């Protein structure tokens, strides 16, 4: 017994024999108090703009929203019942849509190129929505995954490889904790979540598999199904994610880990869908929103007025970043794997705008004022290390003069330029504060961009 202990002693002492100058990595306990102390990896705040992709079996009926199955079978909303009666044979089940979910035209490289053109710095892809269909070959989702059925391809892997090989975007995954109609979840739910058969046999094994196999740098949890975080063992999983996982140094997480966690616990806050407070928050947050005003998934019945214009999208990006948030802008591909032209157009338009104005978005900080209280539709960001303030204005004044009520300029020190024009602009000081900028006389074709412009102000207070 003593000999065995002596042989084991060197192994026990190994953690103490670190080289000088090497510090032990921070370790987090499986409690919110400990987990919430983890610093958010810097890349996320610097990124500012990401793309959300909702794609699944729901993309085949492509009617109403990605909640099609629930609205049809559970709530039995008349428009969904009528849609099925008018378009599919009696007895057609939701599971039958998977045969039609071919992803025939899905080209991960093409998707990656479009994402790169958008100017986004990260992408979050739905690995599994509330319908339970996994977009990779999960052995916990037998005959209800993209490798066994439908596309018969590992969609997650194909997109991950394309994004990492062809773009500079960080790759992230969305995962729904619960599933609407999974019998084990329904059984646990009927016990008021005293039983934990579903998370133990389904949710947690899939989460560990996703992280180990695809190494996402964003893990976007959703869908607690009315269950508390301890039912999902969220703190235990996150402790492993932060301490031991292959992405422990770079991964960011959101706040949807069980009832009571949203807008309170997690890496960054989402608070609600399309959350956009319009003022500065003390915690990093994200505005996850949709180009289609009414759905995250593709809708075949959508009209042109249902889509946000590029002007509206630029405004959402600017006001979100000015208030310290990131914008996660959603698109919904079709069942055959194509990105609808209107989504591609919006993505490329955002990229065009960011090529000119990205300096005022990426790696910026909030300023002492988020927006101008005198002139509407003017939002501020800053780079204090360079003594720069950016004033992003969404309406070009007819007079050619833009009054900014917040900055205080100094004669001989303050300089003003228009991003994409790069000629010093004349400005005058106003009392008691503010400056008036003489904008350049430009024709439509000389404009550096079309949907919002940025003034770079140096040495203002």
Curated annotation (Swiss-Prot):
Modified residues (Phosphoserine): 295
Glycosylated residue positions: 165, 233, 371
Pfam families in UniProt: Alpha_L_fucos (PF01120), Fucosidase_C (PF16757)
E.C. numbers: 3.2.1.51
Site, May be important for catalysis: residue positions: 288
GO cellular component: extracellular space
Keywords: Glycoprotein, Glycosidase, Hydrolase, Phosphoprotein, Secreted, Signal
Gene Ontology BP term (one): fucose metabolic process
Coiled coil: none
GO molecular function: alpha-L-fucosidase activity
SMART domains: Alpha_L_fucos
Gene3D superfamilies found in the cross-reference section: Glycosidases, Golgi alpha-mannosidase II
Catalytic activity, reaction form: an alpha-L-fucoside + H2O = L-fucose + an alcohol
Compartmental location: Secreted
Residues annotated as signal peptide: 1-25
Family: Belongs to the glycosyl hydrolase 29 family.
Assembly description: Homotetramer.
Main function: Alpha-L-fucosidase is responsible for hydrolyzing the alpha-1,6-linked fucose joined to the reducing-end N-acetylglucosamine of the carbohydrate moieties of glycoproteins.
Protein name, UniProt field: Plasma alpha-L-fucosidase
Organism name: Mus musculus (Mouse)
């Amino acid at each position: 017994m003593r000999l065995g202990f002596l042989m084991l002693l060197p192994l026990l002492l190994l953690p103490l024999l670190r080289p000088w100058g090497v510090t032990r990595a921070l370790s987090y306990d499986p409690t919110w108090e400990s987990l919430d102390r983890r610093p958010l990896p810097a890349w996320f705040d610097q990124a500012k703009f990401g793309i959300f992709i909702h794609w699944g079996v729901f993309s085949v009926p492509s009617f109403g929203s990605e909640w099609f199955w629930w609205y049809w079978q559970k709530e039995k909303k008349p428009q969904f019942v009528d849609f099925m009666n008018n378009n599919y044979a009696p007895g057609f089940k939701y599971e039958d849509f998977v045969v039609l979910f071919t992803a025939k035209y899905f080209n991960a490289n093409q998707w990656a190129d479009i994402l790169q053109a958008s100017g986004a710095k990260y992408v979050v892809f739905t690995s599994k929505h509330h319908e339970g269909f996994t977009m990779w070959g999960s052995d916990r989702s037998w005959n209800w995954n993209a490798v066994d059925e439908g596309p018969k391809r590992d969609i997650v892997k194909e997109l991950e490889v394309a994004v990492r090989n062809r773009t500079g975007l960080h790759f992230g995954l969305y995962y729904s904790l619960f599933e609407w109609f999974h019998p084990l979840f329904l059984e646990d739910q009927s016990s008021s979540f005293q039983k934990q058969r579903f998370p133990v046999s389904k949710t947690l094994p899939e989460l560990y598999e996703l992280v180990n196999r695809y190494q996402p740098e964003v893990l976007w949890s959703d869908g607690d199904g009315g269950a508390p975080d301890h039912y999902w063992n969220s703190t235990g999983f996150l402790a492993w994610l932060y301490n031991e996982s292959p992405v422990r140094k770079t991964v960011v997480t959101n706040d949807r880990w069980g009832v009571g966690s949203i807008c309170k616990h997690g890496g960054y806050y989402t608070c609600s869908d399309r959350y956009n407070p319009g003022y500065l928050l003390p915690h990093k947050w994200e505005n996850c929103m949709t180009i289609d005003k009414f759905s995250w998934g593709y809708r075949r019945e959508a009209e042109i007025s249902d889509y946000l214009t590029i002007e509206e999208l630029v405004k959402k990006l600017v006001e979100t970043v000015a208030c310290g948030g990131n914008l996660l802008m959603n698109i919904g591909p079709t069942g055959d794997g194509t990105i609808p032209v209107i989504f591609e157009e919006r993505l490329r338009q955002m990229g065009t705008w960011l090529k000119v104005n990205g300096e005022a978005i990426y790696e910026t900080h909030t300023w002492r004022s988020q927006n101008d209280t005198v002139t509407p539709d003017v939002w501020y960001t800053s780079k204090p290390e360079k003594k720069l303030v950016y004033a992003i204005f969404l309406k070009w004044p007819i007079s050619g003069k833009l009054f900014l009520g917040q900055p205080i300029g100094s004669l001989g020190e303050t300089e003003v330029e228009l991003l994409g024009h790069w000629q010093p602009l004349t400005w005058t000081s106003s009392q008691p504060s503010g400056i008036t900028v003489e904008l350049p006389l430009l024709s439509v074709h000389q404009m550096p961009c079309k949907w919002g412009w940025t003034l770079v102000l140096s040495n203002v207070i």
